[in-house]
Amino acid sequence: MAIITREKEQLLMERAGKAYDQAIQLLKMMDKAVQDLAFKNDPENRYDTWITLARFDNILQMILLHMAVSDGGISPRERKFIQQIVKYGDLLDYLRQQDKEEDGLTWDKLAKMNASKQAMVVQLLTPRLERLCDAFVKPLAILDGMVKDEDFLKLLLGNVSAICACMSYMDGVSSKKEANACYDIGYQLLEGRWKKYMK
């Protein structure tokens, strides 16, 4: 593992933060458009956009976790990045709420596991996001399919890729395994189902 300076770490966090903010602005705009269409005659059924943004945060953290375990264990800098990049939702908090377990998996517990156990846990957690991913993707993908002069999926994936690229250097070196993990899990959770719902 190579060493990165605090200045480099800060620069990576700033770049990732800009990409994250762009993704959030895009999602806010899309969510408003979806709700304007869906609840035009039923304004009382509108929901807080925070729900959509929290779902995105959970999906993003899962993508980043897959990257972190792809080339070994989750480094302290990777953990910090994964926890600090999001503003609306936390994956492990969400899973504990789903389980109704106060003493479920936490970031501290995950950090104390060895690399192989971390990888196993991340693999086991992924299927538990199926419903959340569908709830996040479906309305946005349908909107994307209706708007012919803009490719919202491409814009969102561009921001996610930029965040992943920054995270890949947090342990000092960017590996092909991390890039592949980002693409594979990103396709599974976002891109593949988005394209399915756009049809």
Model regions: which residues?
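Small-residue-enriched hydrophobic alpha-helices in membranes
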Residues: A2-V69, G73-K199
